[in-house]
Amino acid sequence: MQVTLEKKEGIHCSLLIEVPANEIDSVVSKEINRTAKTIKMDGFRPGKVPAGMVKKKYGEQIRMEVISDLIPQKYSKAIQDEKLAVAGIEVELKENKEGQPLKFVANLELFPEFEVTGFEKIEVQKPVVELTDKEVKQMIENLRKQFATFSEVYKVVEKDDKVTIDFVGKKDGEAFEGGTANDIDVIIGSGQMIPGFEDGIIGMKKGEQKTITVTFPQDYQNKDLAGAETTFDITVKKIQQAELPEVNDEFVKKFGVKGGVDTFENEIKENMQRELKFILQRKVKDQVFKGLREIAKFETPKSLIKREIDAAKQNLLKQMGGAKGFDVNQLPDNLFEANAKQKVETSLILDSIMNSQEFKAEEAEVESLLDELVQAYEEPEKTKEQIKKNDKEIANLKALVIENKLTDWVLEQAKVTEKTEDFFEVIKENMQAQQAGF
């Protein structure tokens, strides 16, 4: 086998590979003889079909099957010999004739080689959130609202009321697509509508019609409406007032709590503290990763981005429960590209740093992280034992321990400031971020 390495611009190169004719023809001949012993053909007993007839009828197909198996073996050997770190590969067949050498080109995209420096340029704003009894009471109030019952009332609309409305949205005096609806239930203050919409209904009565002016958020998904000033003609058809359940033993049983109200409040606070800790860690980590992407200079392999896009599509399909009849591959790649590029770049940067630093996940650290994570489950000890039996889950935990250590290492060198934030705003931002990332 002859191999010629041709270096190209950036992270690209090609391998021109030539396989001797006798090697290819020998394998093809053996496969034809093997096929002749098993194939059924009219006029011949099983195993007695002449190899010449098999070659005449199936020779081209057999040759292509042999080549399809042989090409990956040959370029894998060449890649190994040349000591190349390959991110992606495309094969181009050049010559394929009986009695002639097989020639093909393996166009390679390599993993970039780079060193990350300038950690002191990274700026991180560390959120500081105080969790007091006030936030705990508000959380319990939110849980009460989830179990609220509603009854019709004849008064003006107030916060927390459920109203049934018709509305017509207009931009520049013309109704816009998706801006008209009838018999829609809206809980005032829930934030289910765009900012300003629910506030505009407060004070209205049943049967009243009113036109309000609202401005769509700048980051609204419909670019035609993003940042646009619009009007909504609203008609109130029904007003219902919420009745919240009392916080008693019967109420707390809905959440699987057996120790009464005091136990319930303690568990709520512990859950809030646990959730807050992980969210704040993620917020800091996201800023660190963003900073790393800004200081690291390298070419991102397109093949890795494409692979990540395909994985994101499959993940979306899984979230949709397999959605019969829905071809996720019909979705445009650019819908996923930005997130995919970020993930690939972050992964490459972390790998680069870990290759130069010795971060290890000690068994005690993995155990401690696992103990913390399983507290969110109904049966922590049972969940813990199940996870410990899953090698993939343990590997993920080890990776998370190392990722946390790496983040702390970067933070020691970065410019870190603190910013006081509200608990519920932090939770809301986290939910929005998760939705944006599918």
From Swiss-Prot:
GO terms of biological process kind: 'de novo' cotranslational protein folding; cell division; chaperone-mediated protein folding; protein transport; protein unfolding
Substrates-to-products reaction catalysed: [protein]-peptidylproline (omega=180) = [protein]-peptidylproline (omega=0)
Predominant place of localization: cytoplasm
UniProt keyword Endoplasmic reticulum present: no
A molecular function (GO) term: ribosome binding
Entry-linked InterPro entries: PPIase_dom_sf, PPIase_FKBP_dom, Trig_fac, Trigger_fac_C, Trigger_fac_C_sf, Trigger_fac_ribosome-bd_bac, Trigger_fac_ribosome-bd_sf, Trigger_fact/SurA_dom_sf
Zinc as UniProt keyword: no
EC number: 5.2.1.8
Intracellular or extracellular location(s): Cytoplasm
Domain of life: Bacteria
Pfam family, one: Trigger_N
Entry keywords, A to Z: Cell cycle, Cell division, Chaperone, Cytoplasm, Isomerase, Rotamase
Sequence ranges assigned to domain PPIase FKBP-type in this UniProt record: 160-245
Any one cellular-component term (Gene Ontology): cytoplasm
Function: Involved in protein export. Acts as a chaperone by maintaining the newly synthesized protein in an open conformation. Functions as a peptidyl-prolyl cis-trans isomerase.
Recorded domain comment: Consists of 3 domains; the N-terminus binds the ribosome, the middle domain has PPIase activity, while the C-terminus has intrinsic chaperone activity on its own.
Family that this chain belongs to: Belongs to the FKBP-type PPIase family. Tig subfamily.
NCBIfam families: tig
Protein name: Trigger factor
Protein's organism: Francisella tularensis subsp. holarctica (strain FTNF002-00 / FTA)
